[in-house]
């Protein structure tokens, strides 16, 4: 609470300093610099508000777009790791291969199904999908490693499972991400000042000015809606796509179809 009061105090101090500079400066500046009315001050304020709003929007959009790209990159990393585990399981005995590949498919389907809905509605990960991933890790860790080749295959699969878990952890953080509150405060403050600009500018109310103001409001509203949509990487109308997992599922089918050929007909 003390921090908030201090910040408000700093803002008030700047307001006092600005007014002080303005009043004192008016007394010392040449009379030729003065205007006959305060229209110049109004235009200056509107220009500053416009610039402030544009700067805040640009800053917020850059932050959110980078977060969106990062969230998508995490899904790609997870999808690649899933394919790696599935493919590596081909070099394991038949019973272990079937169990591991089945768990990989189940986990991937849970992510694009129930877990995606949970992230959309609750901004968190699904415990059921986490349980499946834990079962997958246990299955890989318990696979027999009778010789050096089998041990190498198991280690490779465990490394890929670790990559899945890491990408999943990052995705969980992405699902719960929100823009810092102070940026929303600054954004809404700039929006209110911008909307009141029509009052401060002294524009006459006519059909044309009403139409232009309405269009202006639509543009401002569209910007605000877009920002809120970007602030939810895995929910809303502009969420991160499932393409990495859907591609992984397609890859699983391809690997399964080629498995007998790749193994040369040898039993696993």
What residue spans do the PLM features occupy?
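Structured inter-helical modules in multipass membrane proteins
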Residues: 71-72, 77, 83-176
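Juxtamembrane/interfacial segments around transmembrane helices
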Residues: 62, 94-112, 235-247, 263-268
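Alpha-helical transmembrane anchor segments
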Residues: 2-32, 173-268
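N-terminal positive-inside, membrane-proximal cytosolic segments immediately preceding the first
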Residues: 24-46
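Short extracytoplasmic
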Residues: 51, 57, 84-102, 252-266
């Amino acid at each position: 609470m003390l921090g908030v009061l201090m910040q408000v105090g700093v803002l008030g101090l700047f307001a006092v300093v600005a007014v002080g500079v303005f009043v004192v400066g008016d007394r010392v500046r040449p009379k030729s610099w003065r205007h006959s009315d305060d229209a110049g001050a109004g235009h200056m304020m509107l220009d500053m508000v416009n610039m402030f709003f544009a700067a805040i929007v640009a800053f917020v959009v850059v932050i959110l777009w980078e977060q969106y790209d990062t969230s998508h990159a995490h899904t790609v990393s997870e999808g690649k790791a899933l394919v790696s585990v599935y493919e590596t399981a081909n070099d394991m005995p038949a019973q272990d291969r079937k169990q591991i590949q089945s768990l990989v498919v189940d986990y991937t389907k849970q992510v694009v199904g129930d877990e995606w809905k949970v992230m959309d509605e609750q901004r968190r990960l699904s415990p059921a999908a986490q349980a499946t991933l834990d079962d997958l890790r246990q299955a890989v860790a318990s696979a027999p490693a009778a010789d050096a080749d089998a041990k190498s295959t198991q280690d490779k699969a465990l490394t890929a499972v670790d990559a899945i878990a890491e990408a999943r952890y990052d995705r969980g953080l992405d699902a719960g991400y929100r823009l810092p509150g102070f940026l929303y405060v600054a954004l809404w403050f700039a929006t209110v000042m911008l909307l009141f600009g029509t009052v401060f500018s002294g524009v006459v109310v006519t059909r044309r000015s009403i139409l232009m103001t309405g269009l202006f409001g639509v543009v401002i509203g569209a910007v605000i809606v877009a920002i809120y949509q970007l602030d939810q990487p895995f929910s809303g109308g502009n969420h991160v796509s499932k393409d990495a997992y859907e591609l992984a599922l397609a890859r699983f089918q391809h690997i399964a179809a080629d498995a007998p050929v790749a193994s040369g007909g040898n039993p696993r």
